């Protein structure tokens, strides 16, 4: 099993290219099933979850080809959905990735039937699929859950437009319903919809393929269904979580970094907290520069919340920052009930953290000490790498398969910025 070894003490300096967004490319790849011709998706990150989604699409019968790009947009994937004949998504592929549930809406909407195994993914708390099921039922779907599978069908040919109000904000629930509504008969209204940039990116992709959607990025989305989407091309937006992770890493190490072709407007909450921590930040239309040279960060308080609030996917990274910051920082997690699993590993490095329910109180220390640690989920693994970058000695991070689900070549990118980091098998 692979491990990552980090030797701390070197400030990160230089330029980095941010990959396409993991949380956007997965629903967009699912949405290609709605088209009646090939769809080319560019700026695709090379991640374990992307490979899993490709394998799922191929299992359904779709033709999938990956093309390596030589320009800034990177690699592209072309999906030809015209060969889809299978409507069952098996457990052996689904078990490693929760986003596989995003195939439910497109399969049901286009083929009138879908059978998707209940999903897996990071073990960071309960993320039920009941919102997906109820949303699709509002469009006329008949759904049961039997033997670990969601079994859905449409008895009257096509899904019918309807109105659905989410009990709680659900990103993947909004995406599933949005895709299904795009080819349903009539008008659908989605209330209390997720407003995340990745939802907007999916909507813009659907529109590029012929969908009629208004209100994406607001709590109310209106979809006028069309019979089928067309083929086309679309470029995935840059990954805001990877962007934030590299910014925090640079701030922690007292470095300087420049990023081009990013979306600063999707990172207001993160950039605000980094400024509060003492970083000097310059923002352009599609660029971010951060300078923390010669300074120790100040602790920050934060509470996770749905977009445009502070993203839960950046909570672990800011906890790592607070571990070596000056002062005491309080972090409240409101999205998932089990997302402090990285705390025990940070304690092994010498961090001072006290947990009180859904709140972590972090007393900053001047330095951490390298030690063997174990990744427990995707973002926790990133926080351990960040902590290793500022720890004395070597930090060895085990179970990094979590990391490969969401970060493309993170050791190569950090190494290019000056970090002493390597993968060990």
Swiss-Prot record:
Active-site residues, Swiss-Prot/TrEMBL: 122
Xref: Pfam families: EPSP_synthase
EC numbers: 2.5.1.7
Family: Belongs to the EPSP synthase family. MurA subfamily.
Top EC class of this enzyme: transferase
GO cellular component, one term: cytoplasm
InterPro entries cross-referenced by the UniProt entry: Enolpyruvate_Tfrase_dom, Enolpyruvate_Tfrase_sf, MurA_subfamily, RNA3'P_cycl/enolpyr_Trfase_a/b, UDP_GlcNAc_COvinyl_MurA
Protein keywords: Cell cycle, Cell division, Cell shape, Cell wall biogenesis/degradation, Cytoplasm, Peptidoglycan synthesis, Pyruvate, Transferase
Binding positions (UDP-N-acetyl-alpha-D-glucosamine): 98, 127-131, 313, 335
Native source species: Xylella fastidiosa (strain 9a5c)
The keyword Translocase is annotated on this UniProt entry: no
MF terms (GO), sorted A to Z: UDP-N-acetylglucosamine 1-carboxyvinyltransferase activity
Any one of the GO BP annotations: regulation of cell shape
Protein name: UDP-N-acetylglucosamine 1-carboxyvinyltransferase
Primary localisation category: cytoplasm
Listed pathway(s): Cell wall biogenesis; peptidoglycan biosynthesis
Classification via HAMAP family: MurA
Binding site for phosphoenolpyruvate: 22-23
Job description of the protein: Cell wall formation. Adds enolpyruvyl to UDP-N-acetylglucosamine.
Compartments, as annotated in UniProt: Cytoplasm
Residues with the 2-(S-cysteinyl)pyruvic acid O-phosphothioketal modification: 122
Reaction catalyzed: phosphoenolpyruvate + UDP-N-acetyl-alpha-D-glucosamine = UDP-N-acetyl-3-O-(1-carboxyvinyl)-alpha-D-glucosamine + phosphate
Gene3D superfamilies referenced in this protein's UniProt entry, alphabetically: Enolpyruvate transferase domain
């Amino acid at each position: 099993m692979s491990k990552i070894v980090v030797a701390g003490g070197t400030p990160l300096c230089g330029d980095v290219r941010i990959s396409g967004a993991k949380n956007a490319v997965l629903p967009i790849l699912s949405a290609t099933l709605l088209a009646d011709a090939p769809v080319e998706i560019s700026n695709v990150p090379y991640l374990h979850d992307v490979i899993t989604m490709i394998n799922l699409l191929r299992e359904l019968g779709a033709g999938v080809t990956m093309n390596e790009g030589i320009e800034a947009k990177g690699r592209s994937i072309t999906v030809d959905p015209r060969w889809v004949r299978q409507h069952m998504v098996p457990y052996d592929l689904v078990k490693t990735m929760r986003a596989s549930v995003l195939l439910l809406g497109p399969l049901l909407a286009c083929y009138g039937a879908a059978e998707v195994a209940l999903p897996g993914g990071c073990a960071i708390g309960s993320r039920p699929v009941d919102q997906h099921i109820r949303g699709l039922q509002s469009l006329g779907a008949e759904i049961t859950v039997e033997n670990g599978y969601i079994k859905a069908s449409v008895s009257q040919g096509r899904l019918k437009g309807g109105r659905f109000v989410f009990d709680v904000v659900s990103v993947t629930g909004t995406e599933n319903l949005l895709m299904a509504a795009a080819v349903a008969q009539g008008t659908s209204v989605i209330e209390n919809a997720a407003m995340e940039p990745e939802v907007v990116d999916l909507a813009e992709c659907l529109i590029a393929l012929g969908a009629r959607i208004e209100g994406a990025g607001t709590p109310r989305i209106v979809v006028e269904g069309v019979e089928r989407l067309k083929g086309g091309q679309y470029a995935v937006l840059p990954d805001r979580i990877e962007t934030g992770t590299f910014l925090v890493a640079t701030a922690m190490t007292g470095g300087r970094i420049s990023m081009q072709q990013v979306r600063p407007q999707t990172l207001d909450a993160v950039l605000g907290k980094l400024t509060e921590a003492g970083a000097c930040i310059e923002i352009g239309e599609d660029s971010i520069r951060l300078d923390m040279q010669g300074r120790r960060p100040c602790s920050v308080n934060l509470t996770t919340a749905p977009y445009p609030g502070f993203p839960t996917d950046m909570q672990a990274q800011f906890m790592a920052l607070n571990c070596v910051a000056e002062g005491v920082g309080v972090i409240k997690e409101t999205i998932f009930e089990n997302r402090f699993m990285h705390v025990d590993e940070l304690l092994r490095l010498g961090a001072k953290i006290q947990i009180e329910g859904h709140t972590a109180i972090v007393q900053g220390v001047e330095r951490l000490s390298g030690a063997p640690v174990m990744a427990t989920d995707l973002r926790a693994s990133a926080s351990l790498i960040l902590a290793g970058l500022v720890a004395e000695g070597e930090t060895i991070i085990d179970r990094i398969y979590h990391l490969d689900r969401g970060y493309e070549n993170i050791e190569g990118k950090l190494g290019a910025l000056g970090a002493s980091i390597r993968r060990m098998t």
